[in-house]
């Protein structure tokens, strides 16, 4: 996790993204500026196709901007080499998506520990941390179950545990409740808010659900490529 400091955990300035195909150009983001404090939770709403997912991809270092900069712990994330950006991303950011993307051939425990295995953490230590995180999300009794043996809400809880097991400074969540029924979505959102408060991990949550977005500390709207 990030140290307690006035410096934003994650920030972007003048962020723009244009996709080109032949002579055609489509500007999806136009001069977006955002700063995320340690432990802050921000919701981003907007119409379908407004660029919300593109913004998360840029903030997470999964794509590079056409203009502007992304800074992670004050470092110019968008100007790093692919290898360095990948290393820093894996150390400081967690990701949750609408679909859980759990690996079906592995148990819940193994799925959650996978980012630590990739870091070459000693297996016993990785499993111990994964067990603790699964208990945090209420799945301590489902460690050995495969994703196919979990409910939709449980799979998303496991995905959240996987995002947090590396102790990231910020979690980027793209429609994390979009594939769930209303009651389960509420439960998963409650869990994220609780983890945000207990772990002091920042959350940026893209959602189409205005009611859930209203529970964030800040709700921002992306419209015509601009954030307001």
Curated annotation (Swiss-Prot):
One of its GO terms (biological process) is lipoprotein localization to outer membrane. Keywords: ATP-binding, Cell inner membrane, Cell membrane, Membrane, Nucleotide-binding, Translocase, Transport. Its EC number is 7.6.2.-. It holds the Pfam family ABC_tran. It is found in: Cell inner membrane. CDD domains: ABC_MJ0796_LolCDE_FtsE (cd03255). Its main location: membrane. It is a peripheral membrane protein. ATP binds at residues 46-53. Residues 10-228 form the ABC transporter domain. The keyword DNA repair does not apply. One of its GO terms (cellular component) is plasma membrane. Coiled coil: none annotated. GO terms for molecular function: ATP binding; ATP hydrolysis activity; transmembrane transporter activity. SUPFAM superfamilies: P-loop containing nucleoside triphosphate hydrolases. The complex is composed of two ATP-binding proteins (LolD) and two transmembrane proteins (LolC and LolE). NCBIfam families: LolD_lipo_ex. Belongs to the ABC transporter superfamily. Lipoprotein translocase (TC 3.A.1.125) family. Part of the ABC transporter complex LolCDE involved in the translocation of mature outer membrane-directed lipoproteins, from the inner membrane to the periplasmic chaperone, LolA. Responsible for the formation of the LolA-lipoprotein complex in an ATP-dependent manner. This is Lipoprotein-releasing system ATP-binding protein LolD. The gene is lolD.
């Amino acid at each position: 996790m990030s140290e307690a400091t006035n410096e934003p955990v994650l920030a972007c300035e003048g962020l723009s993204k244009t996709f080109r195909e032949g002579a055609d150009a489509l500007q999806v983001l136009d001069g977006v500026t955002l700063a995320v404090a340690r432990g802050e939770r921000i919701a981003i709403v907007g119409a379908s196709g407004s660029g919300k997912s593109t913004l998360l991809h840029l903030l997470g270092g999964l794509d590079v901007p056409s203009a502007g900069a992304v800074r992670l712990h004050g470092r110019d994330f968008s100007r790093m080499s692919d290898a360095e950006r990948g290393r820093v991303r894996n150390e400081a950011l967690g990701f949750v998506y609408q679909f859980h993307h759990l690996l079906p051939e592995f148990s819940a425990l193994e799925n959650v520990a996978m980012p630590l295995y990739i870091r070459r953490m000693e297996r016993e230590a990785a499993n111990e941390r994964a067990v603790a995180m699964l208990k945090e999300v209420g799945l301590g009794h489902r460690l050995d179950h495969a994703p196919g043996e979990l409910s939709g809400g449980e799979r998303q809880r496991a995905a959240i545990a996987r995002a947090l097991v590396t102790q990231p400074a910020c979690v980027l969540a793209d429609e994390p409740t979009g594939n769930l029924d209303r009651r389960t979505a509420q439960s998963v959102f409650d869990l994220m808010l609780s983890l945000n408060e207990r772990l002091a991990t920042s959350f940026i949550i893209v959602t189409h659900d205005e009611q859930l977005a209203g529970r964030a500390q800040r709700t921002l709207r992306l419209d015509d490529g601009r954030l307001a």
